[in-house]
Amino acid sequence: MTTQLEQLRKLTTVVADTGDIEAIAKYTPEDATTNPSLILKAAQIAEYAPLIDASIEYAKAQSNDKAQQVQDTCDMLAVSIGKEILKVVPGRISTEIDACLSYDTEGSIAKARQLIKMYNEAGITNDRILIKLASTWEGIRAAEVLEKEGINCNLTLLFSFAQARACAEAGVFLISPFVGRIMDWYKAKEGRDFEPSEDPGVISVAGIYNYYKEHGYKTVVMGASFRNIGEILELAGCDRLTISPNLLQELEDATGEVVEKLIDTNGNKECPAAMTHAEFLWDHNQDPMAVEKLAEGIRNFAVDQGKLEEMIAAKL
């Protein structure tokens, strides 16, 4: 029998959730996603040392201000890693903007434009890039502007239905609802494990997927943040799934049957009026898990961004 990874590929676009080019080349995904934590991890791989050195040289040529040099080095490093990854994936790379801009619409737009400019100057066209933004109201508004400029966005740290609905209404290209982190919260709260079919993260993503398809929204649903292959298999049929190398290996080693769980209904239900800012905040706030996990996710990405900046500053 074929492997579960091979079977899954027939139902879902498989994406690698890593900045490790060797791992990406091994599993031949369509796309790859990175985030500040993964860039920090990748920056510690010996093979990437020349990319760091080249990024520092670039930054020094742009400015004499050390703080600006650190920012420019981090941006160029993320783009350089993305460019290397694009040599081994046929599709897109997702590159995330600084988590410190999560509540700054104008700052997010400016940073996204800067990253796109750097990619374009490196010969990478917009159709191979997704700019990752946190699914805050401000991040969603930034994405709405960027999409109209032909800059496709990946809205991440998505935990609530309110976030998912607002993203679809803003016309964003893709969302990354987090499965495992939702399950983590409920596991800690209820003190028990969940079967994949009753996993709160799985149920959340399936609900978002079905809502999008019933209403004809074009936004791509890419399940993310998996803790085990059971969660992945319960979402077989989702538009895309971004999976870490260790779980890709588990799927490669397993041969049980993979059944399509999510099916596009091609619905045409009337879409509700777009949410107002007040409605978004109210609805999101009704979900304590989502409120806590969004804030925690932004803080954690900011911590890893800070560690990367410290590492770069020490080399300048």
From Swiss-Prot:
Pathway per its UniProt entry is: Carbohydrate degradation; pentose phosphate pathway; D-glyceraldehyde 3-phosphate and beta-D-fructose 6-phosphate from D-ribose 5-phosphate and D-xylulose 5-phosphate (non-oxidative stage): step 2/3
- An annotated GO BP: carbohydrate metabolic process
Q: Which UniProt keywords apply?
A: Cytoplasm, Pentose shunt, Schiff base, Transferase
> Matching InterPro entries, A to Z?
Aldolase_TIM, TAL/FSA, Transaldolase_1, Transaldolase_AS
Q: Indicate whether Transferase appears among the record's keywords.
A: yes
Q: What's the chief localization of this chain? A: cytoplasm
Task: Identify the domain of life.
Answer: Bacteria
Q: Which residues form the active site?
A: K132
- Coiled-coil ranges from the UniProt annotation: none
| GO CC list | cytosol
Keyword Metal-binding listed? The answer is no
Q: What does the subunit section of this Swiss-Prot or TrEMBL entry state?
A: Homodimer.
| Family note | Belongs to the transaldolase family. Type 1 subfamily.
Please state what the protein is called. Transaldolase
**From what organism does this protein derive?**
Aliivibrio salmonicida (strain LFI1238) (Vibrio salmonicida (strain LFI1238))
Which classification does the entry list for the species? Bacteria, Pseudomonadati, Pseudomonadota, Gammaproteobacteria, Vibrionales
